[in-house]
Amino acid sequence: MATNRTFTMIKPDGVQNGHIGGIVNMITEAGFKIVSMKLTQLTVADAQKFYEVHAARPFYGELVAFMSRGPIVAAILEKDNAVEDFRTLIGATNPADAAEGTIRKKYATSIGENAVHGSDSDENAAIEGAFHFAGREQF
């Protein structure tokens, strides 16, 4: 297993519901190193660009509105097998289907408000990390 990076966001519901500390704690306890992190807010245009891969999907407009409604925490994480291990840590998109001990099981309230985003591939992790962090912000 090679050490690599993944990207995550604590979504507006996770921030609004006061779960930043709990989620970050779960991430670090799972062995991830936080190499970049910031509190920010996506504009509608930012959210449209970030999620443009979903533009043709029926939930796109709702997703863009949700992701731009309040602050998020964006982070780049490092660990052996980072993408796969983080996807396991966050759990299924639907918190009702998420395994016990996962972030979404503990902090998500619905499919739409599922607390966190995690990259689905090494390639997307690099793209998503670069979207939120300039090279000088990545350590």
Swiss-Prot record:
EC numbers for this chain: 2.7.4.6
Tell me if ATP-binding is a UniProt keyword of this record: yes
User: Which residues are annotated as active site?
Assistant: H117 (pros-phosphohistidine intermediate)
Q: Which BP terms from GO are recorded?
A: CTP biosynthetic process; GTP biosynthetic process; UTP biosynthetic process
Where is the protein localized?
Cytoplasm
Could you tell me which CDD domains the record lists for this protein?
A: NDPk_I
Sorted keywords for this record are: ATP-binding, Cytoplasm, Kinase, Magnesium, Metal-binding, Nucleotide metabolism, Nucleotide-binding, Phosphoprotein, Transferase
Which SMART domains does the entry mention? NDK
Which residues are listed for ATP binding in this entry?
K11, F59, R87, T93, R104, N114
Q: Does the keyword Kinase apply?
A: yes
Which Gene3D superfamilies does this entry report, sorted A to Z? Answer: Nucleoside diphosphate kinase-like domain
For this protein, the record's SUPFAM superfamilies field holds: Nucleoside diphosphate kinase, NDK
Main localization of the protein described in the UniProt heading: cytoplasm
Q: Which family does it belong to?
A: Belongs to the NDK family.
Query: What is the documented function of this protein?
Result: Major role in the synthesis of nucleoside triphosphates other than ATP. The ATP gamma phosphate is transferred to the NDP beta phosphate via a ping-pong mechanism, using a phosphorylated active-site intermediate.
Quaternary context: Homotetramer.
Under the heading PANTHER family, the entry gives:
NUCLEOSIDE DIPHOSPHATE KINASE (PTHR46161), NUCLEOSIDE DIPHOSPHATE KINASE DDB_G0292928-RELATED (PTHR46161:SF3)
Its protein name is Nucleoside diphosphate kinase
Organism of this sequence:
Flavobacterium psychrophilum (strain ATCC 49511 / DSM 21280 / CIP 103535 / JIP02/86)
Lineage runs: Bacteria, Pseudomonadati, Bacteroidota, Flavobacteriia, Flavobacteriales
